Structures are given as structure tokens and as C-alpha cells.
């Protein structure tokens, strides 16, 4: 089953699976892809991007960059981008980021230099309820006019700019580092130098480094202090046509690693890169808790699971996108695992702590939560299953719930599984190819009957 089917399954049925074996080509990173697409679109001339992700996030960024005036074509695994000079954009633009927070916030940064923009979404119960107050406040300090819904500055959002921006702003990154990344893009396209102060702490510094590295690749040098709290973007720098190569997606990679590490498995993963996986933190966590992982030539790894899983705590700030996947695997550990420093994952496509716990409870997984912690009480003897669970429009939760469902005695139905396509459209096809027992189903009345 793939999410490219014309008729999307209403549910995926996940059934007990004993072993996994085979090979998977890991999907490309949504974080690197969205940034590379935007950078190339903002660069007058021709840039190329190899291995662009095919998920909803990347497609949303591409469609919105086309609204800016950029154009895209494909040559094999390479995307050719003809960029645009935003100084020549003088019309109203309506951006639709879909359900992607990173697309929204990066484009809000760019919109700070556009005369008239509006942001809308059809995902009013997901992205539509997420706060953009930190970004709006930072833009207003730079003399950008912003109108949004309520004190949380929710969508729809309208922005107007005279391009006479201030030289300094500050932003809170407690909920998301994406606000800072958007402001870095604004500084990169502006005529004047821009200083940005982070007033608290950055929840996912690795993602900010991804932004900085992407901009540097195109010739824009972002400076920052030793504390990684003060940032300077020189107005004299300009984007230069570049060649980008995108590595593996961290959330998707973590999901496959956790899945294979939870069952008896012997699986090879192609296209493995660690740049967004906490600089080895995820691999160390998996090996420390019982999974065998060997590095192979050519950016490949071999993963072998089946041993008992040991409970262990994990600092989620090192790899935020990996937390749901690792927590799903921890449900089968002998003992209690605490995932900490993770308040910011409450503000993703879903509340990845409270929403996740609601679904874990349906499956019989014992858990607790604090503001910045998810505590999983493992049970190596598996769970009964036989429940309908909700993925909450969230690819991370859908993949984590799938891992748990493969261990359950009775089938588990996951609602609206196509949202996994946010980062990994072929997730169910890929895990099916290595032996996972999953089937897409269309049951129009099941939700009312069993939810």
C-alpha cells in the first residue's frame, strides 16, 4: 500500500508480526529538502537538488515556491530549480503550507520581505490550532505588519512589509526552533544586517544547524555566539546558485530503526546519514538497549533485533523527531523509560505527549507525563490490541503506533494512515516488503462503530 493511491485507505490494519528481513531505501529528509527547495527558489539562476523528499512537506514547499515565481523540473533523482529575485515580487501571494509547520514558519520569514501575503490551511484542527505567536511577535519588532487569529496568532495570517526592516529582533524558541530558522531566511534575503537574540533556549539546535548549513552552502554566512543564542546575518551576502544533496529523514529513519529493533529482524537500510539524528544519540540509544547495528560501506547500516529490550532514559532534545518512535519501542522494554526535555514536541502536528498517551492507553500501554516528559512503563509480554487508534494527523504518531500494533495479539486499526505521507509516503509499502503484516482498508462506518 502506498499513499499515492487515488483512493486513500480510511484505516491501516496492523497485525502481529514475528520477523522482518530485507532491505529498505530510506526516504530523504523533509527538513533538508524544504530548506534546499526554498534556498534554491530564492536564488536567481539555476540550482540543483539531488534526492529531494517526496512527502507532503516537500511538495507543499515546492508548490508555494512556485507561487513566488520559481520553477521546478526533474532529471532522474535531481530536481532543477530556476529561482526568483524576491526584490521583484510586488504582488499579493497566498501561501498554503498544508499541515507543515516548518513550511509555514520558513515562508513567514520570507514573507517579512514581501509586500502582501496571506497564509491559509485546510488543516484547521492541526496546523490551524498551533500557535505562531512567537514568530508574529518577532516579525512585528522588525516593522512587519501581521494580522492573526487570537492571542496565539493562529492561521489565517496576513502580512505586509515595506521592506524597511529593523536591524534587531528577539524570539522565543522554547516551543520550536523553526521560528528562528524562518528569521534567518528573512535576514538572508534582506538588504540590511539582522541580529536575532533567542530569549530562552533552542529546543532543537540540530535543526537550526541544518538551516545554517543550508544557507552557507548557498553563500550566506550566519554568525552566532558560543552560547548559540545570538545570531547575525549580514545583509551584503546573496544567494548563489548551488548543488544540494539531501540525506535521510530523521523521523522516518528513527521509525524504521525502532521498528526493526523491536522485533526479530535482519534488515539493511540504504541511504543512512546521521546529521539529523542527534549526532549518534539515536543509534547509541538503540544499541545500548539491545539492538545490534553495524555500519556498512556506501551509507548503509545493518540492523538486527530480537533480543530483550532494556529500559533506558533518553534526552529528547538531542533528536526530537525520534521520540515517538523510540517511545513506541520502549513499550516492550523490561522496566520504565523516561523521555525528557521534550516539552516542544507538544507543539508539533499533534501534542506528541498527551495525544500519544491517549492512544497508548487504548492499547494497554502504561504511561505517565509531565510538562516536558513522557514516561513509558514497558511490558515485554506484549499487549492485547484489538483497538482503533487515532494518528492525530501526525506521521510520527502513526509510525510509532504501527510498531506497537505489530506486537499485539489482535489487529490494531489506525485511522487516516495517509498522513504518514507528511514525511514518508511509502512507509507501509516499505515495511510490508520486509515482512510487516499491514493492510490498507476502507471501512466508512468503522470509526463510528468502534472508536
Curated annotation (Swiss-Prot):
Coarse class of the protein's main subcellular location: cytoplasm
GO cellular component term of the entry, any: cytoplasm
GO molecular function, one term: 3-phosphoshikimate 1-carboxyvinyltransferase activity
CDD domains: EPSP_synthase
Localization per Swiss-Prot or TrEMBL: Cytoplasm
Pfam family, any one: EPSP_synthase
Protein residues bound to 3-phosphoshikimate: 30-31, 35, 176-178, 321, 348
Domain of life assignment: Bacteria
Membrane-crossing segments per the record: none
Chain segments annotated as coiled-coil in the UniProt record: none
Keyword vocabulary terms for this entry: Amino-acid biosynthesis, Aromatic amino acid biosynthesis, Cytoplasm, Transferase
Function noted in UniProt: Catalyzes the transfer of the enolpyruvyl moiety of phosphoenolpyruvate (PEP) to the 5-hydroxyl of shikimate-3-phosphate (S3P) to produce enolpyruvyl shikimate-3-phosphate and inorganic phosphate.
Quaternary organization: Monomer.
Similarity comment: Belongs to the EPSP synthase family.
Protein name: 3-phosphoshikimate 1-carboxyvinyltransferase
Source organism per UniProt: Burkholderia pseudomallei (strain K96243)
